[in-house]
Amino acid sequence: MTKLTPEISLSVSPDLASPDLESLRDWIRAHRVEEIECVTPDFAGIARGKVMPAAKFLRESEIRLPVSIFFAGITGEYADVDHPELYSDGDITLIPDLTTARAVPWAGEASLQIIHDVVDRHGEPIAFAPREVLRRVLRAYEAKGWTPVVAPELEFYLTKPNTDPDYPLEPPVGRSGRQSTGSQAFSLSAVDEYDSVIEHIYDYAEAQGLEIDTIIQEAGAAQLEVNMMHGDAMKLADQVFLFKRLIREAALRCGSYATFMAKPMAGQPGSAMHVHQSVLDAQGRNVFSAQDGETSPAFDHFIGGQQKYLPACSALNAPYVNSYRRMVKYMSAPVNLEWGYDNRSTGLRAPRSDPKGRRVENRVIGADANPYLAIAATLAAGFLGMVEEVEPRPAVAGGAYDNERDLPYS
């Protein structure tokens, strides 16, 4: 892998105190932005939208797309859905969320991408749009005076360019001139093999104003993990959505591919999107911790809700046939929803922490999941557990792989 210096077309993103179209207009002119990418996530988490000159975006009253963008699968084929709107394929209107304006640093000219919400012809939110699904869950928390906090960890593989799907994916050649073949988890030398891609990731993330906590080598050959800072659930879902595209572009710039398939290579561990979750009350206190610093009933009930309801959410956490190839015993992936303290063999892990940082890690979600839908599902399950006071099963102290499987096989 040749060492390349990142070429950045726009190295900074808007940081507007109270974003509105006029302040964004001034920023666009000051930074000589040429193009705007109007994007919205589909069910697969793919960015769908339109690209237009900045001047057109600033004067455009409405931007529209056909509703069929939500009925296309990851291959582009339309799902067999009996929905009347699919037959007429009418328009939906995009509404820009100006707080999401970010540079497109890999573009040939200065460009911004802006995530949009979508409404129907009556101006009502499209209920099944991924951001709206997550927003409804967050409103349920808000009605109780709670605020969920999440921190995603996103795993992915770097591979050699592969243009023929009949051939298996292979690790790329690193800076040493060799392919990675074995497990080198947490090896700094393994990370250094792909320092060109990682440098591009860091530079692109800085240009987009995205915070990276850490980047590590995972257990697979050329498998990396990006850990994100904890924060607001919608903002973090937006960041995962943006990061996937950013990482793919960084890899392409360095002559390799990045894949978020749950199980891209036989014999190698799969890729997950682990999500750490906690809940704050109106005073900003972690509801998972009691006043004496021990675990609270809300902590137990949150876990109980995840155990009760996450199996029904499997299509959101593991959306493809390939997703279930990841869930294999002794391959760094859970096969059930047991929980335990600092136990990575369970689907739900309670990491070691102080009372303020007490949280529950969902280790079931695959890297191929739509971040909005997966985060909505895991938070909804925990919410129902707290509201219904669902008691969890006893914590597992040892390995959980041989416990009864309660996650589906397909």
Q: Where do the model's predicted regions map?
A:
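Short glycine/proline-enriched loop/turn "hinge" motifs that connect secondary-structure elements
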Residues: 103-110, 148-149, 215-219, 268, ...
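Accessory "access/gating" subregions that flank catalytic or transport cores
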Residues: 185, 189-194, 198-212, 226-233, ...
